[in-house]
């Protein structure tokens, strides 16, 4: 046997030895890449809070700002999935924890930072705190909080019904669908606000609608329109939904997000973060079932 090995052509010996070596190196390389990808995720679902500094503050409207928070590394990514949220926390001077959930509007795969669009409520403990922060100040985060697990092409079409700051998870869903060339889901967004100045993410939404006119259709509703306003005024009516949303069907789905009065009018609010509760309101009156509606 050894004589046979000795007679192997020396010209091919490096290739005989090299094949398993390459396979072994390939395994370690791919394993290392996987570990690096995993370690680059900022939020991994553990119970630890992480403090992130503010790197930028952009004023969007009279009561809304976009806050950019910097990750520990420029190569870090969120670790979030589409339509998931994060918990934020600060400690009051008396030592009490104030914790609130927020959905980032930045891409879940964006490197280096995340963006929150936050509306200031005068009686809101968290929004008062965040609006008092300056660049380089920090805020504590934990997550992710998974919500709806989006699978491309799960439905032929979806209807998104949003009010005010409820646009954030809906925008994240719109952005994820439209950026995926293999996801052919049709999207209708009905978005309600008090005034034209209150419409959040309008620039981004309009750009997406212009870029994907065959896939995304947006209707804005203003309840107290300015003089000369030419869009839809008033609330998102039962009649409008009946005429413009898909009829209840396994091939379509409805997603709703907004403040409590808004939720109560259209779908009813959730019982808890993990319990959707029963379906009530306009969507139930139109024949939808709880299996066809998701409340963010």
Curated annotation (Swiss-Prot):
Protein location: Mitochondrion outer membrane
Cofactor: FAD
Transmembrane segments: 15-35
Membrane topology, record value: Single-pass membrane protein
PROSITE patterns: FAD_FR
Protein's UniProt keywords contain Metal-binding: no
Amino-acid biosynthesis found in the keyword field: no
Swiss-Prot/TrEMBL keywords: FAD, Flavoprotein, Membrane, Mitochondrion, Mitochondrion outer membrane, NAD, Oxidoreductase, Transmembrane, Transmembrane helix
Gene Ontology biological process: cellular response to oxidative stress; ergosterol biosynthetic process
Enzyme class label: oxidoreductase
Catalysis: reaction(s): 2 Fe(III)-[cytochrome b5] + NADH = 2 Fe(II)-[cytochrome b5] + NAD(+) + H(+)
EC number: 1.6.2.2
Family of the protein in this entry: Belongs to the flavoprotein pyridine nucleotide cytochrome reductase family.
Protein's name in the database: NADH-cytochrome b5 reductase 2-A
Organism: Vanderwaltozyma polyspora (strain ATCC 22028 / DSM 70294 / BCRC 21397 / CBS 2163 / NBRC 10782 / NRRL Y-8283 / UCD 57-17)
Gene behind this protein: MCR1A
